[in-house]
Amino acid sequence: QELQEMLDPYLDAQGYRGEYQLPLAAFLRTASAREILSRYLRNLKAIYSQQERWERLLGIQQRLVILLPDAVEEIRDRGLALAQLDYIRPAVDDMRRYIDEVPDASDFEEIQAQLIELEQQIKHH
């Protein structure tokens, strides 16, 4: 009851009152170990990306790809980290997989342009 009273102002502000009111349990759902770990890794990912710590970021991306095998954006992001570290061929593989699997992605053209640039680098070596 006390928790519900503390939440009421927030619920009012978000429009979750009246006919749209959700039971308190909906807000207190237990997170799975996978959800907790992926949240932790994504927080580290944001930190390392912001700090441009590419080697550490790559380690996080490797873990995210394993933990979330269906999350193709994590494969894309691993490819971007690989490119920053000049691991061109694996970066190309990841980016190609991303655009092949998500041809309607909002960043398709940007990733495709980076992919073309990386493929040019391979041809010149």
Predicted regions and their residues:
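A structural boundary/capping signal
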Residues: 1-125
